[in-house]
Amino acid sequence: MLVAGQFTLIPDSAFEQALINLGIDNALDGVVASSSISAIDTLIISNSNIENLEGISGFHSLTYLDCSVNNLDTLDLTVNYLTFLDCSGNNLEYIDISNHLALLTFKCNYNEFSQLDVNANTSLLYFECYENQLVSLDVSSNIFLTELRCNANQLSYLDVEGLDMYVLVCDNNQLTTIDNLSDNVSLKFLSCSNNNFYSLLLSAHPQLNWVSCSNNQLFQLDISSQAGLNYLFTWGNPSLNCINVSDVVVANATWSVWDGQSGNIDGHHYFSANCSISSVNEFKDCKKISSVFNMYGQETQLIKNTPLLYRYDDGTIQKKLILK
């Protein structure tokens, strides 16, 4: 038992020292008076060299916990009921937060998670899990989610069906598309650089203010519906030529060529109000097709009378419309 009579055991001296620094405890003796912690609702003990949070169960009223930047390998919060949790910057591989039904903010960046289960956290509004080892992420139950930052993982699939987020950051993954992105009509900030996107159609997101899609394999980019777009980064997409916009004059005046330190677009990119198939560079047909994608970046079969993206065995990509 962690709670022994009138005292709660705190075996980690760094944890207890953090409590002393906060005026919650008064002596480094391995225990804290249970009456001193039972009513505490907020505990910020970040960057304290803590290796073990045994004793946290004695904080019966705790709703806000920041234990980031410590040396935790495990974190047992099964008897707490949090609305805010930041456990970023530890060595965690597993965490059970299924009992935190009122959790609104969850930050677990810079850990070693390969999977996370947030299905029970249906009230979640803000979710950060970047710089982990996630190979999958299910947010289908988090219908109130407004901000998701899952960059720098190993995700090859991301479905945001039924959500309406304001912010989505998914850079540095292995994504070729984001399923049901169009559901998120309130999206204002999208950052998806350093992935494998072939196409990015954003007509369903007129409120976008920021789009960063650098270092992909984009062949098509349509930002013609984003009248309020102030920030655009498309460099590092060698197969992208024409960027569809509503006002070419404004686009040319707003965004400049990337020079290695600053800028927005590659030198061969240009803006047009009507990027057509004829604007695409033609390739020789002797190359072997390795895969075919639709305009949403999803792999598909050959379909006549439908514009598709053809990836060849030499790595080049071609947009073609094959007529009957």
What are these model-predicted stretches?
Residues M1-Y64, L101, T122, I143, ...:
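N-terminal capping/linker segments that flank leucine-rich repeat
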Residues I10, H268, S272-E299:
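Residue-level detector of functionally pivotal "anchor" positions at catalytic/ligand-binding pockets or at interdomain
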Residues D41-L43, L65-C67, L85-C87, L104-C108, ...:
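Conserved hydrophobic beta-strand positions in leucine-rich repeat
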Residues S48, N70, N80, N90, ...:
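Consensus "Asn ladder" position of solenoid repeat domains
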Residues L53-I56, L75, I95, L116, ...:
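Canonical leucine-rich repeat
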Residues G58-S61, T78-T83, H100-L103, N119-L124, ...:
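Leucine-rich repeat
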Residues P307-K324:
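C-terminal tail/sorting-segment detector
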